[in-house]
């Protein structure tokens, strides 16, 4: 697992180990022990999966009363992903970060207190 920080405090791109051969590939998509060691402990309360057609914009979404962190991954196709820091006491308050996600081994960690959304670039994603 490789961690690449960005301009949003606490956010990062996680590049998972991908094992590939003639049969296909294998990726361990989440390991609580590794995640906690690299990023910290967060209780995950929900797991969502969506499929969107090209040109669909989802977001920007955020939670006011019960902020949630998100692990965002595009397993098929490509998306233009955006996060905005809405944490008033954060040194990156009101800053944004964008990335094209198009590899199943890449996951964007979006800490609690962010607005998040994405735009579908490919036919489906």
Write out the residue ranges for each language-model feature:
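Conserved metal-binding segment of the jelly-roll/cupin
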Residues: 100-123
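Non-catalytic, conserved peripheral segments adjacent to functional cores
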Residues: 1-101, 122-125
